[in-house]
Amino acid sequence: HHAGLVTAAEDLGGLSVSVQNAGVVLPGFSWEIPLDRWQLQIDVNYWGVVHGVRAALVAMTRRGTGHVVAVSSGAGLVAMPGLAPYVSSKHAVVGLMESVRHELARAAPGVRASVVCPGNIDTPIAEHSLAVAGVADEGLSAPSQSVADAVRAGVAEGASPQTVANSILDALGSGRFWVLPQPEVAIGALDRVQRILDGRDP
């Protein structure tokens, strides 16, 4: 499908903006989550973004202009319990886009890259993820289930999706790489760096 996107972009006068947003989350302790649910989260959250970003970059680097945006998560900067596959995949998206940014600076400076790291956003991701996995519930132990329930509660209390959309539009105007719609994500990332510097545990 890379070739198809490139051909379509050329037929339409070129691809100017590409926003990659893919996510499923199936919480639980890492040793309780079945491997097929690990695989699903990595496939959608990481490989889905890789395919989209790579196809967009092929088209954009040919023209020398464009802006590719990938939506990661606050979980791409700060880890939390009960979300190991999701956290791993979202960290991978951040690493991908940082590498892409370095590459574009050297090979195609007219093409911009941004990574979006939202905190909790009020979406039906939890319900949709169960449907994609084809299960009614995670089938977790009680301690693991309590963490999963807390994840869902946090999502339900999250910000509006419009918050993320507005931040992406701002980034397209400014060319900013790091896009953190909610300040608590930056605070969490700063705390992580300080813990690394101090040699303290997460």
Model-found features: residue ranges?
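A glycine-rich helix->loop->beta "capping" turn
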Residues: A8-S18, L26
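Conserved hydrophobic beta-strands of the Rossmann-like cofactor-binding core
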Residues: S18-V19, V68
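Substrate-binding pocket helix/loop in short-chain dehydrogenase/reductase
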Residues: F29-S30, P34-Q39
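Active-site loop-to-helix junction immediately N-terminal to the catalytic Tyr of the SDR YXXXK motif
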Residues: I33, A79-V87
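Active-site helix of classical SDR
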Residues: V53, S89
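Residue(s) in the substrate-gating loop at a strand-loop-helix junction
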Residues: S73
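SDR active-site lid
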Residues: A105-V179
